[in-house]
């Protein structure tokens, strides 16, 4: 419906704005418009994983392990020049942000790691982006 489309566009803009604030290198930011579809996919994946773990009453330790394994998927070593090139051409956010930006928007992550406002990955609840 028209209302669904409007709601989706508002939601999508919030995700674009959220990712566009991440500075990857001095003066170089993620292009939230270019990466939005992949960002939605990453956010959806970790939110589904979190919900499944909560539904099966996984322990905090099991949930932390799942998040650690998710982070390991995106470990890479590359040059700064290569990262700058990817910012210009890739439809994915840089791997570091595929982990940090996603987990920083996941409420369960805050609970199992006891994150507080002074922690580097902390984002206030009203600024976190959600898919579901």
Residue ranges with predicted function:
Residues 1-132:
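Zinc-dependent metallohydrolase catalytic domains
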């Amino acid at each position: 419906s028209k209302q669904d489309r409007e709601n989706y566009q508002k939601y999508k803009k919030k995700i674009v704005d959220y990712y566009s604030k991440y500075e990857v290198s001095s003066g170089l930011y993620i292009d939230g418009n270019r990466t939005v579809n992949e960002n939605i996919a990453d956010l959806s994946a970790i939110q589904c994983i979190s919900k499944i773990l909560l539904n099966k009453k996984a322990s905090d330790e099991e949930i932390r392990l799942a998040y650690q394994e998710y982070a390991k998927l995106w470990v890479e070593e590359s040059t700064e020049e290569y990262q700058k090139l990817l910012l210009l051409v890739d439809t994915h956010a840089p791997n570091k942000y595929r982990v940090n930006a996603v987990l920083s928007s996941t409420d369960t992550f805050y609970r199992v790691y006891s994150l507080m406002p002074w922690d580097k990955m902390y984002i206030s609840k009203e600024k976190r982006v959600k898919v579901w």
